[in-house]
Amino acid sequence: MWSLGGLRLAAGHCLRLYERNASSSLRFTRNTDLKRINGFCTKPQESPKTPTQSYRHGVPLHKPTDFEKKILLWSGRFKKEEEIPETISFEMLDAAKNKLRVKVSYLMIALTVAGCIYMVIEGKKAAKRHESLTSLNLERKARLREEAAMKAKTD
């Protein structure tokens, strides 16, 4: 029986074979801007792109929102909100988010350990008072039997 992954591999293999063996005028292309003229593919005339201010060294920049600014502050990347530049790279924001995720996970681990320790202490106090689930259930059942007996006597 064919699995879904096997079908994908087979389809990809067949497509690569077809692309390799197809004639140049009929070759598949992932660039949709190509035009077919007289059996030849030509690229349309492209105007030279002017570098925008949002790209510096080939890295796209992003204007952070207020919440993202708080993330940058909480992660320790910047000390004050005034220090945060107008635009930041996505890599800087991802690094700050990852650092904050790690800090939050450490906080949750610490709270879980503290909660476990607190429950152990409370359980030992309840054991000293001879309080257990078994004794509480026996008391509740005895009280319910008494109420049922009182109700039976009044009827």
UniProtKB/Swiss-Prot annotation:
This is Protein FAM162A. The keyword Protein transport does not apply. Residues 77-103 are annotated as: Required for proapoptotic activity. Proposed to be involved in regulation of apoptosis; the exact mechanism may differ between cell types/tissues. May be involved in hypoxia-induced cell death of transformed cells implicating cytochrome C release and caspase activation (such as CASP9) and inducing mitochondrial permeability transition. May be involved in hypoxia-induced cell death of neuronal cells probably by promoting release of AIFM1 from mitochondria to cytoplasm and its translocation to the nucleus; however, the involvement of caspases has been reported conflictingly. Belongs to the UPF0389 family. GO terms for cellular component: cytosol; mitochondrial membrane; mitochondrion. InterPro entries: DUF1075. Keywords: Apoptosis, Membrane, Mitochondrion, Transmembrane, Transmembrane helix. One of its GO terms (biological process) is positive regulation of release of cytochrome c from mitochondria. It is a single-pass membrane protein. Induction: Induced by hypoxia. It comes from the Eukaryota. The chain crosses the membrane at residues 104-121. The keyword Transferase does not apply. It is found in: Mitochondrion membrane. It comes from Mus musculus (Mouse). Pfam families: DUF1075. Interacts with HSP90AB1; HSP90AB1 is essential for FAM162A mitochondrial localization and pro-apoptotic activity. Interacts with VDAC2; the interaction is probably involved in inducing mitochondrial permeability transition.
